[in-house]
Design a protein with these regions (language model features):
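Domain-level signature for soluble enzymes in the chorismate/prephenate branch of the shikimate pathway
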Residues: 1-272
Length: 272
């Protein structure tokens, strides 16, 4: 089984892939979410792991559009606690460090810690990639922010642990595929959808009332501008349910009240 991840081995995406699918998988490394979406859309992997939101930094909005624009399907989700650590080439003193480098999302999640340093903050494409580069090139003036898996895999020394601003730092990942038939959920109880509404007063409230009347629990709503139409928005939602039949009835009714509805996937709620 081929599973694509954003980043390289030792990254948080790699950890999710191993925990979700097990160790007997072939990992395909992608250095950007765009590359990940392209690889999945082209059918070069069976599944892909994509971070979608974080409890500190919020939604990764471009990733919603990548799933939508590439007609990808969400077949599962996974949550992990993110514990960021500062790591250096073995033996290097923190006072000798000039730069601290990591993925922009990791830097944002460690904002309070970074404010207290006099180091130059450098954005990079992946947490684990920075760690690997430090080791491969014997870089001694740069520290990486990454997970413990990266430190262990690339032989770096961890000098500060759990440097994220909020200690309960959780990230939600979705498991995506090109084909809906690759779904691995037998009894789905969560769905991800997109809908577009007209500019009528109360149109959004009407949709929310339909969901509530069918016993659907809205767990996420994210508005995203429609580029071609200024000041018009599409809504991406996650909803949980206990009765699949009532869910389908609700979506049928929502479709009649919306300009368009698109279902990205039904799957098992990780939190249930």
């Amino acid at each position: 089984m081929k599973v694509a991840i954003q980043g390289i081995k030792g990254s948080y995406h790699h950890r999710v892939a191993l925990e979700f699918f097990g160790k007997e998988i072939d990992i395909l490394e992608c250095l950007s979410f765009d590359d990940l979406a392209d690889l999945t859309h082209e059918g070069k992997c069976d599944y892909a792991i994509m971070a979608i939101e974080n409890s500190i930094a919020g939604s990764i909005i471009p990733n919603y559009s990548l799933i939508d624009d590439n007609d990808l399907h969400i077949i599962g989700e996974y949550f992990i606690n993110i514990n960021h650590n500062l790591m250096v080439y073995p033996g290097v003193d923190f006072n000798k460090i000039i730069n601290i480098s990591s993925h922009p999302m990791a830097l944002l999640q460690c904002k309070d810690f970074l404010k207290k340093t006099d180091k130059i903050i450098v954005e990079d494409r992946d947490t684990a990639q920075v760690a690997k580069r430090i080791r491969d090139k014997n870089i001694k003036d740069t520290a990486a922010i990454a997970g413990l898996e990266a430190a262990e895999m690339y032989g770096l020394e961890v000098i500060k642990t759990n440097i994220q601003t909020i200690k309960d730092n959780e990230t939600r990942f979705v498991v995506i595929s090109k084909s809906k038939s690759k779904s691995i959920s037998n009894n789905p109880d969560k769905a991800s959808l997109k809908f577009i509404l007209s500019h009528r007063n109360g149109s959004l409230a009407n949709i929310l009332n339909i969901l509530a009347s069918h016993d659907l629990n809205l767990t996420k709503i994210q508005s995203i501008p429609i580029i071609e139409t200024p000041w018009k928005y599409s809504f991406f939602i996650d909803t949980t349910f206990s009765n699949y039949k009532k869910y389908k009835e609700a979506i049928k009714k929502v479709s009649s009240q919306s300009e368009m509805v698109k279902e990205f996937g039904v799957y098992n709620n990780f939190k249930s």
